[in-house]
Amino acid sequence: LCPQSKPMGGFARTSPSYETPYKADDAMGKNGWGEGYTFPCLFRNGDKGWILISETGVDSKYCGSRLLGHENGLYTIGFPQEGEMNGNGTTAPGLALPGETPWRTVTLGETLAPIVETTVSFDVVKPLYEASGKYEYGRGSWSWIIGMDGSTKYEEQLRYIDFSAAMGYQSVLVDALWDTQIGYDKVEKLAKYGAEKGVGLYLWYNSNGYWNDAPQSPRGIMDNAIARRKEMKWMQSIGIRGIKVDFFGGDKQVTMQ
């Protein structure tokens, strides 16, 4: 189980950020750090097997939820905390009738195989739109996990493109600060170099509007429709494979919107 953290804490007030440590083999009847647990939640039913409880199909018509623990092994659905999104937005969703909630799924398995292999989170959800092509993530490399912000440099990303190509990987994730430490012009060169080797690029973006203090850039783009469309057009023109958006402000409906 992954405890839900209190809002507006941690690095640059970015919590709850779904980065708290998992607690293995914890006792029933607890409530994490007092705020419940983040989905998905995995339970072991003695020697009988495993139970995975999760949520899927959350969109702008509702909010994301968490699992609240009570005494005697009772767990209930909980709405977002009031302080999320810097206090902006309501904790309860506004839902027009007729309406529907997101799916809450329960997956059972005598072993962990059905838990790992289940596709129920995709099976019950209808696509919101028809994709313009067949998209596959594949395998990739990522310099930040070792070198952090300082590794987002042109020469280092060239090295990671070469590494991905040598390993037969399909991509490289270029993380935070690429806009200032590499620059848009050189990102285009990286994308072209990667394409020649069969390696696509993912670019990192800060989700920030007003909901936390995380300074890493690019920021002020993904929360603005006009800026976002312009950026997407540029990425499409140079063959960027996808994006990683970081520092979401919480699970309120305003975030989903």
Predicted regions and their residues:
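N-terminal accessory beta-strand-rich subdomains and adjacent acidic, glycine-rich linkers
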Residues: 1-123
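Tryptophan-centered motif/residue detector
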Residues: 4, 11, 142-145, 178, ...
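Noncatalytic linker/hinge segments flanking ATPase motor cores
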Residues: 15-28, 146, 183, 214, ...
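A broadly tuned preference for mixed-charge, low-complexity surface segments
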Residues: 20-43, 154-160, 164, 220, ...
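Generic recognition of flexible, low-complexity loop/linker segments
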Residues: 91-94, 160-161, 190, 231-232
